[in-house]
């Protein structure tokens, strides 16, 4: 049986400015760089940063420690207007 393809609607889109309303980054403002609709998550530029340790791939190489942006659930963000410094309260 073939699975039916469904469109998952999100209230935010890539490139929009949002404010985080819940979690350890609460109150911070950032721009969405990627939307993950299947898991209802978004990745915001320079927010929700995590440290990742990478193992050495070759014998002579050394490992790395990199910092990456982790996804945050879309219900924890709200659209934000930079020109008037206010958040848009209604959710779609």
Swiss-Prot record:
Key words, A-Z: Chloroplast, Plastid, Ribonucleoprotein, Ribosomal protein, RNA-binding, rRNA-binding
Main subcellular localisation: plastid
Keyword Nuclease: no
Location relative to the cell: Plastid, Chloroplast
Cited InterPro entries: KOW (IPR005824), Rib_uL2_dom2 (IPR014722), Ribosomal_uL24 (IPR003256), Ribosomal_uL24_KOW (IPR041988), Translation_prot_SH3-like_sf (IPR008991)
Pfam families to which the protein is assigned, alphabetical: KOW, ribosomal_L24
GO biological process, one term: translation
Molecular function terms from GO: rRNA binding; structural constituent of ribosome
One cellular component (GO) term of this entry: ribonucleoprotein complex
Signal peptide: none
Family: Belongs to the universal ribosomal protein uL24 family.
NCBIfam families per UniProt: rplX_bact
Function according to Swiss-Prot or TrEMBL: One of two assembly initiator proteins, it binds directly to the 5'-end of the 23S rRNA, where it nucleates assembly of the 50S subunit.
Quaternary assembly: Part of the 50S ribosomal subunit.
Name of the protein in its database record: Large ribosomal subunit protein uL24c
Organism this protein belongs to: Gracilaria tenuistipitata var. liui (Red alga)
